[in-house]
Amino acid sequence: MPVSLSTALRVVGTSLFALAVLGGILAAYVTGYQFIHTEKHYLSFGLYGAILGLHLFIQSLFAFLEHRRMRAERQPVRLGRSVALCIAAYQEDPDYLKKCLLSVKRIAFPDLKVVMVVDGNGPDDTYMLDIFHDVMGSERAGSYVWRSNFHARGEGETEAGLQEGLAHVQALVRSTTYSCILQKWGGKREVMYTAFRALGDSVDYIQVCDSDTVLDPACTAEMLRILEADPRVGGVGGDVQVWRRGGDGTHGGTALALVALTPSPPQILNKYDSWISFLSSVRYWMAFNVERACQSYFGCVQCISGPLGMYRNALLQQFLEDWYHQTFLGTKCSFGDDRHLTNRVLSLGYQTKYTARSRCLTETPTRYLRWLNQQTRWSKSYFREWLYNALWFHKHHLWMTYESVVTGFFPFFLIATVIQLFYRGRIWNILLFLLTVQLVGIIKATYACFLRGSAEMIFVSLYALLYMSSLLPAKMFAIATINKSGWGTSGRRTIVVNFVGLLPVSVWAAVLLGGLAYTAYSQDLLSDTEVAFLISGAVLYACYWVALLTLYLAMVARRCGKRKEQCGLVFAEV
């Protein structure tokens, strides 16, 4: 069969499958078909709930199978390949940057080239260059303060000076083991482009890393193992995890005892700094070890995260210019860099994978507003890249199509459900919905406790409320402002508070409170049965929160603020 005809058939088939999935979910939602229900429908179980439950079960099953496959991996790592680690830095907290660079020096991989590019070349940025020299060693490190960047001249820069700077940056990066470039501000994508362009085809693989990331010594070798094992894989991402300290304070076992096969507890650098950073840590674990692990089973991980990822350089150089010059609705894109990098790999028909054996620590916002801004930025890139990703459904497993449809449209179904319940239902319907949300959260949390082997994962169920109250309106706001660009969150050295993110949350809260008041006012008098259900449901809901908050105070709150223990890692020591 001709290639063009085969491709056309796959496009048609995949498109029909996507429409069938969406149509099936929509039909189940609209018809409201119920398998079982009590008299007057106080309790019921319908087709729509069954579909969502089946989705969670299948996703969890394939995630489990992928973890089992990861643990069984025994193929030796070929250390003869050349790898460059590219670090993107912007107004980084000095302590985080130092920890990042110290962990880089401890990576167990021979002749690893390190390129750090700083987004900014002013007096307020030079402290990062000083830290780079202090940690990496001035005798092996080269540096250059560039007045320009690859796409914009610095103030007073001539064309000849620009070309001289370009040549100097490329020569420096290719000739030195450790190099640090300070360049004219241009955003994270500009920083990444400089590192990729300067390296050219001088290495086989490129590893990416953010300046707030602490890397496990085996992370590079473990990602390389995946890429070397299958030429169809174009990129691989790792996990945010902790490697346990050995009893003598050295690496627990051999240097490439390679991330113990028994799952150790994932963590974030500032996990216990606040309630929001703690909940983010358990959410990160679910995102990586369930959602992305499932995607990895089918070779279609849709986002290789910036803190820890590796790509085939030959592929990266192939789409570098298209990646950098990406536009959306006529506007140049300057966020979603990592997701679009992953999408470019997928667009070429290559697989993307995830390995829990490659680990790192990263920083997450500790304040609600900064976290909200971060989530809004990520949601913008998700919806924009969803449209781009849909162009390549036919090149990959049907799971990629199915999951994209389900996760892409789920927020809209959820909003429609909430508004309908709050404005057209009864008080009991609203309470039952809240109970159902938490029940699903508890089921997911129980599975996470089993998979990870940690009781802390029970707090995944708390994240459900955060999703309903904050993430849902943030996603809608992200769609409304999808073309507004920027880093989205400020640098960590100077935190800038942005109150814009509160607008959609406030509007959403007003909508819900208004609906609750309207329903309470307009509904008929409650029957004795409904009163009994309301009292029972309210008591059950209150008991749930009392139990979870008690556990939180006992297990988590007492540790908040004790950042010292976060540095007690083999690869995070200072």
Swiss-Prot record:
Transmembrane segments: 16-36, 45-65, 399-419, 430-450, 457-477, 495-515, 531-551
Bilayer disposition of the protein: Multi-pass membrane protein
One Pfam short name: Glyco_tranf_2_3
Membrane-side (Extracellular) residue stretches: 37-44, 420-429, 478-494, 552-574
Alphabetized UniProt keyword annotations: Cell membrane, Cytoplasmic vesicle, Glycosyltransferase, Golgi apparatus, Membrane, Transferase, Transmembrane, Transmembrane helix
Post-translational modification: O-GlcNAcylation increases the hyaluronan synthase activity, HAS3 stability and its plasma membrane residence. The concentration of UDP-GlcNAc controls the level of O-GlcNAc modification.
Annotated localization: Cell membrane; Golgi apparatus membrane; Golgi apparatus, trans-Golgi network membrane; Cytoplasmic vesicle
Protein name, as recorded: Hyaluronan synthase 3
Gene: HAS3
